[in-house]
């Protein structure tokens, strides 16, 4: 396993992890690694790791990976993405940008949920069954 963690300032939450789950025998994974490392260098605010699910089985645990490479993006709040990804630097970069844009602040989520709760008949598609 290779890990490239940036130093975290004590005053902020830990950086999200971007983990490529791969296998040494996978030619696509071997070709993808330099591109993955290039994206890692371009995003120093994130932590990147390369995990060979066979060589690093003690770390990979029971992940059932069927398609390589598989990407896992997770932070302190949970899994943001897990699935196979086309092995292109541009695809990974777009995925990371989309995940960052799609992660609203807790205040924004709380405000939306409060508005929905205040007028459920206006928004709810089907009321919950009694």
Predicted regions and their residues:
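Charged phosphate-binding loop/patch that engages nucleotide di/tri-phosphates or the phosphate backbone
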Residues: 110-130
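Local sequence-structure signature of Cys/Sec-based thiol-disulfide redox active-site neighborhoods
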Residues: 2-39
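N-terminal/domain-start segments enriched in small and hydrophobic, helix-friendly residues
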Residues: 6-9, 13, 92, 99-101, ...
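Glycine-rich, charge-decorated loop segments at or immediately adjacent to ligand/cofactor-binding or catalytic sites
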Residues: 60-65, 109-113
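Active-site/pore-lining binding-face segments in mid-to-C-terminal subdomains
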Residues: 61-70, 74-77
